[in-house]
Amino acid sequence: MPDVSRRSFAGLLGAGITASQLPLAISGCSPVSTVTDPERAQSWYIDGLSFLPADLSDIRASKIDAFICDISAIEQVEQADGTVNYRRTYRACMESIGAARARVAAHPDLLRLALTGADARLARKEAQTALFFQIQGADCVEESLSQVDEFYLEGLRVLQLTHHYGNVYAGGALDSDDRGGVNLPLSARGYELVEKLNQRGVLIDLSHASARSAHDAIAASSQPVVLSHGAARAIVNHARCSPDNVIRAIADGGGVFGVFMMSFWLTTAPEPQTRHYVEQLRHVANVGGIDAVAIANDYPLRGQENLLRLGNDNTQGVQEYLPWWQSLSERNVLGFDRQPSHVVIPELNNLDRMARIHDAILDAGFSASEADKVMGGNWLRVLEQVV
């Protein structure tokens, strides 16, 4: 089934084909973007979560103007009972943010460390890409909230409360007990952290948080909050996906919800396609309004690296996730009873994904102004308001 460019969109409508029936590229195809240079000049491309790549040429090739850059580092920690856990510790993350800051400073022709939302516009004016440093989990704030100040001075501008599992601040989406998944609230220390982040101008990220903790944080925050990378539970009934009431609450507070690239949380279809990604975007728009919809990645800019080595063969690529998936299935965590069959949408697992998404949402009937909001305008609005 061929990809349909929006240049042929009007003709198809005239033939009686509705927007919901329009085909998008099947897995393995590599459609060429039809977004023209003048159109691109008017649009912002902002990625809600990726990483500083080993090859910095990936940044220019991706055509993104800015992205939330996860600079987390994980340290092996021995628990009191002798078991080993892996956490984003203060020490590990302080080292990693320092290294990332030095790397950005060494490439002023290409990169700008964004310390305020306004830096995104300055970066674009200077043909740079703006990076908003983020850490995926408040575990890095260990001893005192004064450590938030230390990270802030190093350039941290987005902090995620949890990563998969809860901590002293908030419940995680995948928390469980002997009876199955649990939905834990924000703790007293979590409320203090929210207040501190608001005071400092650090954007609060609810990705990986439990639904209850997400609602608590939204209610407590004096600023918009975001869920930088996730998907809708109404489409895939899974603990890692967000229920509509969380999406709506984020939107009502002026925040945004970024839809990521992990296809097993985007669709239950056996072959993930771009249209499934667009369906997630449309669902967020229907629930929270167009001002809440945003793009995210959660893989490196060029894509999920193991899948790229495998030629985007999902049958092979999904194998690395199955032991972890099975472990949570045994704990009766929502959604893990259905084994995944894919990891990526092949036609989006590449450096050109933003332009391809731009094409796809225009082909699906989003207006040009709506597409501009989704591709980066909504991210820009929130970053400028909060950071």
Give residue spans per PLM region.
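N-terminal hydrophobic targeting/anchoring segments and the immediately downstream early-domain regions
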Residues: 3-23, 29-180, 237-247, 251-252, ...
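Divalent metal-binding pocket/active-site signature
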Residues: 140, 153-240
